Amino acid sequence: MKASTLAAALLVLAAHVGSAEAGDPIKPTGTPPEPRFNRLYDTEAVGKFLADYARAYPRWVKLTTIGKSTEGRPMWLVTVNNPETGPELTKPAMYVDANTHANEVQGTETTLYLLNFMLTRYGKLERVTELLDRAVFYFVPVVNPDGRSKWFGQPATPHFPRTVATPRDDDRDGLVDEDGYDDLDGDGVITRMRKKVPLGEGRFRLDPKDPRMLVRVKRGERGDYKLLGWEGFDNDGDGKINEDPLGYVDPNRTFGYDFQPRYVQRGASDYPLQIPETRAIATWALTKPNLAAAQSFHNAGKMILRGPGSKHVPEYPRADIAVYDLISKEGERLLPGYKAMVIGKDLYRAHATTVDHLYMVHGAISFTNELYRAPTDLDGDGHAKPEERMKFNDLLTLGRQFVKWKKVKHPQYGEIEVGGYRHDVGRVPEGWLLESECHRNAAFVLYHARQLPKLSIARTRVRAQGKGLWRIDVSIANERAIPSMTAIARQNKLHRADLALVTGAKVIASGIVRDLDLDKIDLQRHRPERLLVPGVAGFRQQRLFFLVQGEGEVTLRYESLKGGLLESRIKLVEPSTRKEFK
């Protein structure tokens, strides 16, 4: 065998072996956790899982905190990065958070599922391997640890607690949080209250087919039951019940961008980023210039949401909307029954939300998924009727969801009944439905993350210009949908443009090639060796021009805050064979 042939064969073999090693599964150095994803976990259990992942994968997983909650609980931050392919800030980043609202719990399990899936599938699934090799992931699995702890540890409803634990005088009587829900029968769940009254004094009657349910009487009919709301009594003697529970500060209405006060939007804090939970996220995000995409998990309704959340937020640039549409439309296919929607246009007005803040301040393509919709529409007419919910309870959960009515003494109402659906019904799937929801939404995040900028030096061309001058044309390609600088980032100058640096020779001129055929170039006036590039659009190329004086070779370094780093050495020669620059 000729020496040249042998050398070539060895190079091919070395490249093959290196590729195999790079794709080897991650070998844990400790015992990795094995969570089951057909159940929910309280705050302490989630923290233990995260610590176990960090111990099992110490080179890949870093567990820190981004701050403390209102009551002093840690807000965990999980960073997943392949150290063999570079430091985290040199790669595009995907941010994922969950459980912003206390009662919207299963987003945390979805985040755990995604974390577990990536770590255990690296080296086994090509798409997972490629993604973890070129991107970094940041997870905040529990944005509201105080609220999660209360939802799991105290009597709750499907809708309460929702807020952070900031005391608030909701009824403006000078006291804070003094009249919340009360577990009248001591069963650990807040259900409904109903009272039998003399015929004609009520607006409801028992359903003749199922006395567990009440039906509203029609005009001319007389009822003998009243519905009295959630379990509770008049704690403060003001004649009202449950009017001032845990202070209503909605963390997803307290971010910095498009903040509006409480007289405009219920749930607002006194000023932007007042509460430690959202302030911690906003402050941390400022330290991550590589943040290019974001995903928040909420519930419920099966929706894939993006901003703008209100008319105060300008309409997103068309180029960015195209990226949003591409990702969300694929999401509708990955998530049967989910619908892509614009918050302020298709749903409701919402100010100072996570998605608007991360997009309008950081230029990150951001979604909120509203997880799950109870599959209780058994006849497929688009409406889940009370009798269908009860049938689902009886036949599919064998009665688990509905708490039977029980007589209790009420300090204001006298003898009443308490009963109804448990706090984990309606917004949260049963365990046998949870894992499927986790997987499909994790797959959506991975698809979203797959669209993070993937830059490469597609082509270079060197031509002698005489007298030691060389013209260098470089084409930077983006193989994915998200640009290395979103349109909103360019429009509002949210962060530094991409930077192309040439060293090793004197740079006489540089610029962006606008028309290759006509050789139209937008020249940069100052410091041509540091060419500012307004990003590379998704599935496009950006063509750069340099005129240098020197000999030997130069080094081209392309630095993109959202798209990572590229570096190439370019010889100042005109080779006899070179791919034509197009």
Where are these predicted regions, by residue range?
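Acidic carboxylate motifs that coordinate Ca2+ or other divalent cations, activating on Asp/Glu
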Residues: 169-173, 187, 234-238, 381
